[in-house]
Swiss-Prot record:
Gene that specifies this protein: ruvA
Name this protein carries in UniProt: Holliday junction branch migration complex subunit RuvA
Residue numbers spanned by region Domain II: 65-143
Subcellular localization(s) per the UniProt record: Cytoplasm
Function as written in the Swiss-Prot or TrEMBL entry: The RuvA-RuvB-RuvC complex processes Holliday junction (HJ) DNA during genetic recombination and DNA repair, while the RuvA-RuvB complex plays an important role in the rescue of blocked DNA replication forks via replication fork reversal (RFR). RuvA specifically binds to HJ cruciform DNA, conferring on it an open structure. The RuvB hexamer acts as an ATP-dependent pump, pulling dsDNA into and through the RuvAB complex. HJ branch migration allows RuvC to scan DNA until it finds its consensus sequence, where it cleaves and resolves the cruciform DNA.
Annotated region described as Flexible linker, given as residue ranges: 143-147
Recorded GO MF terms: ATP binding; four-way junction DNA binding; four-way junction helicase activity
């Protein structure tokens, strides 16, 4: 099975990216957070990969860090949570923030992630609350709090820049998304709102 890809970013979409390795293009699914942090098209990249094989599909799921990959595997082990939903969860929070929310049993916060809901959030906490404590993430061990608004804003602008938008466009869209959704919104929600603003011209 493919476990790592080192090559060039060929193209990026909203949910996946194609990585050129020796003339072969691999389409890899990423969380929206990871996708926003990928290098620009034409730039070199090195990502960790998990291969999921089903009767009708052969999918690759990519990660920028070992911690992200470990959390994906834990999420995917939960009953009725497949790889796609696992990526949606990873799109809702940075990994240290997500691990902290799971370990503290923050059901309400997890339920706000797009595609999760209360029942799934309760199941995630029930099955993973103790398991995530075995993941040794430096930021979590220090008791990291959720990212500050300024940090989230910078991450959002960076993600938009990596999709090819210009700095003024990205800044304006990030500001609009923050104004419309408020400080409690997840990164994924802000990202979608910013893209909507860019496509509609603000």
């Amino acid at each position: 099975m493919i476990s790592r890809l080192r090559g060039t970013v060929l193209e990026k979409d909203l949910e996946d990216a194609t990585i050129d390795v020796g003339g072969v293009g691999y389409r890899v699914n990423f969380s929206s957070l990871a996708l926003g942090k990928l290098p620009a098209e034409g730039q070199p990249v090195d990502v960790r990969v998990r291969t999921v094989v089903r009767e009708d599909a052969f999918d690759l799921f990519g990660f920028l860090t070992k911690g992200e990959e470990e959390v994906f595997l834990l999420l995917n082990s939960v009953s009725r949570v497949g790889p796609r939903l696992s990526l949606m969860v990873l799109s809702g929070m940075e990994v240290p923030e997500l691990v902290a929310a799971l370990s503290r049993g923050e059901v309400a916060r997890l339920a706000k992630i797009h595609g999760v809901g209360k029942k799934t959030a309760e199941r995630l906490v029930l099955e993973l609350k103790d398991k995530v404590k075995t993941i040794h993430l430096e930021a979590v061990s220090r008791g990291t709090a959720p990212a500050a608004v300024s940090g989230a804003h910078a991450d959002l602008v960076s993600a938009l820049l990596n999709l090819g938008y210009k700095q003024p466009q990205a800044e304006k869209a990030a500001d609009l998304a923050s104004e419309r959704l408020g400080a409690e919104a997840t990164f994924q929600a802000l990202f979608r709102e910013a893209l909507k603003a860019l496509r509609s011209g603000g």
